[in-house]
């Protein structure tokens, strides 16, 4: 099993200009390889996949000998065609670390037992982390996939950048999301300071309310006032005299009254 994982059965052609895909160059290359030069290798071919959005072609065989044979031919072919920025690699296959699509019952049971053993070994190790750098997490770097080395052997990274393109005509570039700068200690201290400030502000507000309530004085208490309307001059003079004499008294005047003597139909 270990020998199979070390087999180099994948060929990568990278940095292919976009014009090559427009002119159907990958289709012509497939015809040259498997219909003209190596028709007997068609049965050993697992994948021939052009990826225009990544500017590359992936070719995967089921054995290393056929892979190296096609790889040497591609080296000579690209040198003759003056390929320019295109690069050629032979690497381990992406399919080596994946389980087959179908297994027998015995194989499934043995696979489950192996997975349980691995889980028991790593149960006590905290692997959840925002920063996946092995220097921080303490995980063995050999057990990590270095940013898709099978797809980009010359740009392997433990931080796993993302390949982005702003438009169909622009070149792809690697983008790495920055780590958050706020630490747990700083957030806890900020929450503590907020709690302290809120606790100290509440008593001061209560004291201000008590002071404002105790310092309020009533300057005038409203009382029901009344008006008197009378048609007689004697009663008006008497009421005015009485009001002048008893100005300091708190007796309210009588309620106003209107008398209707006659009704007109």
Swiss-Prot record:
Principal place where this protein is found?
cytoplasm
Superkingdom of origin organism: Eukaryota
The UniProt PTM text for this protein says: Phosphorylation of Ser-152 and Ser-160 is induced 2-fold in response to mating pheromone.
Annotated region Disordered: the residues are 127-213, 242-265
Signal sequence range: none
GO cellular component terms, semicolon-separated: cytoplasm
Q: Where in the cell is it found?
A: Cytoplasm
Q: Which residues carry this modification: Phosphoserine?
A: 104, 110, 152, 157, 160, 183, 187, 193, 201, 255
Give the stretches traversing the membrane. Answer: none
Q: Which UniProt keywords apply?
A: Cytoplasm, Phosphoprotein
Keyword Cytoplasm attached:
yes
Modified-residue entries (Phosphothreonine), positions: 132
- Bias (Low complexity) ranges: 141-161, 182-202
**Additional notes on this entry:** Present with 967 molecules/cell in log phase SD medium.
Can you name this protein? Regulator of calcineurin 2
Its gene is: RCN2
């Amino acid at each position: 099993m270990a020998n199979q994982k070390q087999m180099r059965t994948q060929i990568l052609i990278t940095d292919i200009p976009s014009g090559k895909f427009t002119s159907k160059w990958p289709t012509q290359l497939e015809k040259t390889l498997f219909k003209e030069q190596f028709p007997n290798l068609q049965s050993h071919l697992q994948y021939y996949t052009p990826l225009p959005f990544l500017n590359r072609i992936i070719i995967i065989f089921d054995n290393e000998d056929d892979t190296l044979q096609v790889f040497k031919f591609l080296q000579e072919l690209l040198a003759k065609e003056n390929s320019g920025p295109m690069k050629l690699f032979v690497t381990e296959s992406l399919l080596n670390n994946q389980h087959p699509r179908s297994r027998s019952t015995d194989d499934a049971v043995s696979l489950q037992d192996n997975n349980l053993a691995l889980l028991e070994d790593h149960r006590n190790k905290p692997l959840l982390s925002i920063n996946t750098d092995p220097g921080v997490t303490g995980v063995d770097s050999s057990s990590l996939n270095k940013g898709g080395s099978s797809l980009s052997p010359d740009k392997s990274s433990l931080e796993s950048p993302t390949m982005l393109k702003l438009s169909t005509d622009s070149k792809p570039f690697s983008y790495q999301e920055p780590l958050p700068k706020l630490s747990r200690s700083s957030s806890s201290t900020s929450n503590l300071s907020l709690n302290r400030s809120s606790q100290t502000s509440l008593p001061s507000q209560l004291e201000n309310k008590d002071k404002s309530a105790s310092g309020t004085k009533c300057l005038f208490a409203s009382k029901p006032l009344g008006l008197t309307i009378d048609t007689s001059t004697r009663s008006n003079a008497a009421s005015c005299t009485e009001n002048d004499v008893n100005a300091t008294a708190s007796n309210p005047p009588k309620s106003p009254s209107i008398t209707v003597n006659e009704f007109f139909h």
